[in-house]
Amino acid sequence: MDNFKIYSTVITTAFLQVPHLYTTNRLWKPIEAPFLVEFLQKRISSKELKNTKAICHIDPSWVNLNASFIRDDMISIKATTDDMDLDAICRISLPLPMNTNDLTAELEKMKRILLDLSEKFNLELIITKEPAYFTPEQTGESKELCIYVHALGFRSNLMECEPQLLAFVDLIKKNGMTLPPQHYIIEPMELNSYSVLPLYMGVDMENFKHISRAFKTSIYAPSLITLSRDLKANPQIFFSGAVHSLSLLARKTLRESISVNSKSFFYRRLTNITPGKLLFIRKYYQQKVNQLILKYQSLIRVTNEYIEFQSISTNLLEMVIKNFTIQVLHEIVEVQISLNENCAMSPELIIDSFFGHTGNQIVVITPKEDSFNQLIVVGNQSSTDEASDTSILHYLSDFIMGSNQVINPNLRQIKAIFEIHPDFEDFISGKKNGKLTRIMELSACLIQLEMEEEDDNLYLNLVSDSFPDFKESFKNVINEFPAEESFFIPEVCHRPIIGTGGSLIQATMRKHNVFIQFSNSFNLPQNKISMIRYDNVIIRCPRKNKANICLAKNDLKQIVQEYDSLQSKTLIRFSSGQYRHILHVNGQKNIIGQIEKNENVYIMIPLKEPLDGTSQLSIQGNDENASRAANELVNSAFGYEYEFKIDQEIDPNKEYEFYNLIVVPFLQIMNIIVTFEKDLITFTFEKDTNENTLTKAIELLSNYLETQKTKIIFKKIIKKFVLGSASSKSNTSNSNTNGNFRSMNNAKSRTTIDNTSQSGASPQRHKMPVITTVGGAQAIKGYIPNTYYNGYGYGYGYTYEYDYNYANSNKAQTNNRHKYQNGRK
C-alpha cells in the first residue's frame, strides 16, 4: 500500500491535570499542541493556560480536528488520519474505599507500587480525593471515605497494565489499606503467549467464573484486545484471595486443567483481505471479535496484513472461521468509485465529504497523489446504530448525490465488492443463478461471482454506472445474504423434531420459509473445569425474512417441550463434589458426550455447580435407555462419598484453618475432595481409593475437629447414586437445554457461608475440584492446508434442508476452484 493512503477517524482524549493527593509525574506536560492551545484559549486565560499541564497526543499529520469538553478535566478530540496505528490516550479510573484516618501514611505505602507500574508501562498514575475524569455511580448516601486511582496513557500500555492495577486495587480494598497484606494475597501466573488466553478463559469466561467460585478467589486477566497487538512481555493472570493455599490451588487448577503443553494447536490465516478492510475490523468490530473468541475458545488476531486463527481442534477452527466470515466479513463491503478522466478529486474533498462528521464509521482509500479520479470506500452493509444511519449507502449518497453536484455527473462506474463464505454460493445466487439474474433484470447492473485459486472466500462484484441503479441493486443483494441464528437443543430431541422422513421439520421450514440444519457436538472438545454445550441447530433464511427465524425457533422449542413431557427421567443423587469429579473425568474422556451418543439420552448436567446442598441430576430418554445411561454415568464418572454430620458448624473465623489443614492437603495429597456446608462435611473420592487412605483421612478430620471442640455425631458412606425414575409430568419443569438439577433439601436447610465481615470476601460455597497432575508433554503443532471450509458442522450424521422458494439452496461447496460470470453482455 505504498502508493495509497488510508483515511479513517481517530478519537483520543486530552486529560487536564487536576488537584491530587499523589501523582507519579511521568507524563504531565505543558500544553503545546497549537490546536489544543487555540481550543482552550476560548475557555481559560493565557496565564491559566501557561500553568496548566495535560496528557494528550495530537499527531501533526492529523487534519479535520474537532474538540469538545467531556468534563472540565477531559477533552474529546476527533480527527482524520492516514495512519493505521489505532493507539490513543485513554484512562482507567477506580474508586478505592478507605478504612483509615491516617491517609498520608497509607498513601506512602502505595507509592512504591504505583511508581513501579508507571515506569514499567509508561503510564501516569494519579490519586485524587474527589472524582476526576469520570462520573461515579450514585449508590445512595455513604459516609465512607473514598479516594480515586487513575491510570492515564496510551491504550496499548493500559491494556497491559490493567490486570496488575485491578489486582493491586482489589488487594488494598480487601486489606483495608494495610500493606504488606495481612490477609489477602496476589498470586501471578505467567502464560507463554497471549494466544492461549482464550483457552484459559473458557467459553463465555466460564473457566474463570468456576475457579473464582470454587476457590473464593478473584481473577484478573489481560484484555482480549491485546490479542491483536504485538506485545513483547508474556501475559499474566492474577489470583487474589484471603486464603493463600486456595489462591495457589486456584492457579494450579487452572494451569493443570487446561494443560496447554499437552495440546495440539491448529492455525490458519486469511491473507487476501485488503488493508482497508482489516483496519475497519480493528476499529469497529473488536467487540464482535471478542464474542467469537470467547464462544469458540479460539484466537482471532487481526493485524495490518492478515487475520490469524488458532484453536485446539480442527473442528473448532473451522467453526470459528466460518462464523467470523458470516458475522464480520459478510457485514463489510468495499465500494470502488471511478470518475471520468477530466474530473479529479483531491484529498481535501474526500476528507470534507466523508469525514465532515467525525463520527462516521468509514475507511477511505485513495492514491497518494494531489488529485485522482478513483477511490475505495469501506463500510458496513447496513446501519449498526439505531440512532443514526451508519450504512455505507448513507455515506455514498451524501458524497455522490450531495450539494457539490460534481461527482454524480462525472460518475463513470461504481463497484461494490462483497466477501462471502464459499458455502453460501448457491444460497446467494439461487437455482441456476436465478436470484442474481432477477436483480439484474430489475436495474441496470452487472453481478459477478469470483473465486481465484489463492482466495479464501468467494467474492460478489456488483457494478453499475448509475448510482440510483447501484443503490437499488445493492439493497436487493444484501436482502439475499444469509441471516441465521444458532443455538443448542439436546441431540436426543433432534429426531423427534425432524419427524418421520423429515415430515415435521419440513412443515416448520415451509411454514416460516426458512431452512434448519442439525449437527451433533459429541466429539467437540471439553475441559476439566466447565461443561460446554455447543450450538448444534442453525436456522437460516435470506436477510429479508430474518424475522421468521424467531418464529421458527419458538416452534422448535414447543416441539421440544412436548417431547420432554413424554420422556421419562432417571434421577441421580448429585452433590457439588460429584459435579467437580464429573467435570474432571469428562474433560479427559468426554464421557457425557459418549453416553448421550450411545444411549440416545440427554444428561441434564448443569453448566454451573449446584448450590442448594445435595441435588438430583436428571437423565432424559426412554425408560430403558435413561436407566442404562444413569448406571453407566455413575460407574464411569462418579466417585464414592463419605458424609459426616458434626454437632456444630465450623466457626467462620476459623475457616482458613480448615482450608489449610483439611481441604487443601486432602485434595493435594490424598486426592479427596472435601466440601462443607453448615453442619455437614463431605468427602468425594475415587472408587479405588485405598482403605488405609480413607481411614487416615477420617482420623485427621476427627483430630482437627477435636481441637475445635467439635465432634462427628454421624457418618455414612454412599456408593449408590441412582435414585430411579421420575414421572415425566412432575419433571417437565426441569427440562432445560442448559442442564438442570433439583435440590433434595429444603431451601433453608443449607445456607451459604458469608464471611464478608471477617475478611471482606463475598458469600461463597466451599467446594474443591479434583486435581490430577498432568504430564509435561510437548505441544504438537498441526497446520491446516490452505483450503476453504467445506460444510463442517451442519449436518454431518444427518441433515434435513428445505427451501420453499428454491431447491438445493445451501448445496455444499466443492473444492474445485473456479471463476464464473453471470451478467449482461
Swiss-Prot record:
Residues 727-766 are annotated as: Disordered. GO terms for cellular component: cytoplasm. The modification Phosphoserine is found at residue 762. It is found in: Cytoplasm. Residues 482-556 form the KH domain. Keywords: Cytoplasm, Phosphoprotein, RNA-binding. Its main location: cytoplasm. Disulfide bonds: none annotated. Residues 741-762 have a biased composition (Polar residues). SMART domains: KH. Present with 922 molecules/cell in log phase SD medium. This is KH domain-containing protein YLL032C. The lineage of its organism: Eukaryota, Fungi, Dikarya, Ascomycota, Saccharomycotina.
